[in-house]
Amino acid sequence: MLLLSAVTTVGCAGQRGAAPSTERTTPVDADTAQRTMIDVVDQATAALGGEWETRTSPDYVESCQLSSNGEGARWVYRVARSESGDAEADAVAASGIWRSDGMRVDRLVDAKGPAMVARGGDRVDTIRFFAFPGNDSIQALSLCIAGDADEIEEQQADG
């Protein structure tokens, strides 16, 4: 069971207590949202090192709700590695990367090991890092884009 801890790290010291904005000033298209999500995951895995395997393809799309309450779609990407590094050092490294991207990073309380979740910024909706013995994983959700997840999935299958 994961519980949200009282430990929150804010990306900008000058904005103590303020959460980074999740609103984009310009809309993003499906390809950009997907590519950016992949880049954010790749940046984290490169910094953490090791052999990461895809568990959920970055082509996986699901429904989400736009800030206008309309229907949207987002990409999901999950990678994992079976050999673990230094769990605490990896959690600190991942958090530092995401804070530098303007994201708010929260540490979740989990008996298995460090669990970090980052939100905000303008690159992904959410990215999570779980440093559990023998099973480190990173999961990212792209920004929510205008569109229908089922239609996007059908287009991928056709194309």
Question: What label would you give each PLM region?
Answer:
Residues 151-159:
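Short, charged, intrinsically disordered terminal tails
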Residues 31-76:
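Compositionally biased P/S/T/G-rich terminal and signal peptide-adjacent segments
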Residues 18-31, 63-96:
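Terminal, regulation- and interaction-focused segments at domain boundaries
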